[in-house]
Amino acid sequence: MDLADYRALSFDCYGTLIDWEAGIAAVLGPWAREVGLDLDDERLLAAYADGEAAVERDRPTAPYPEVLAVAFRRAGEGLGRTVDDAWAGRLGASVPDWPAFPDSADALASLATHYRLLIVSNVHRAGFAASNRRLGARFAAVITAEDVRAYKPAGDHFRALLRTLDDLGIARGELLHVAQSLFHDHVPARKAGLRSVWINRRHDRPGWGATPAPSEPVGYDLEFPSLAAFAAAADAAFAAR
């Protein structure tokens, strides 16, 4: 597989470019201590993961801040504790505070010299705009849950992506989808007939973190431990031309 054969990259944002696990844990951790739970971040994120996926499935048109708040309450119930309105609202409003991964901005800048960049994200428009101030990237298109009124792994984002590719004059076979989540991204990307690159941000940690384990067969074409490693591979591929 030659990375120089492609013209465009579509990215998941949260988990791939923005460290949503750090952002979520920054709220769940203090809450857990307040309510007397002695749980580390990994256990809190695991408790949270299935709740968010269920809310996104059950309330596909809900704004993402509402999804976060309701998922937090469900996680609390599962842990035998109450999440009050203040804590739920704190998580719901936290997206602009979530940090970018240290390599994201530089890697995107490098990749932009070779490809058109697009975003395919489970977020509201204002949330992504705030996150992109940390990334400093220019995207040819941004497709959010607010736009398609659904959340991945439902296929709506990818149907919108294919329409957007047509508008940009890019063939399906000229795009790679780049993402961390097997559950949210690689399963539906493969169903949409797209090739994909797994940015395995959790390569040095066990478990799935804030993401559910994939419930269907999943495939991807390349795997890298970081976005920086992927960008370096792309640079090398184009340099070899």
Map each language-model feature to its residues.
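Asp-based, Mg2+/Mn2+-dependent phosphohydrolase catalytic module
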Residues: M1-Y6, A105, A109, R116-R241
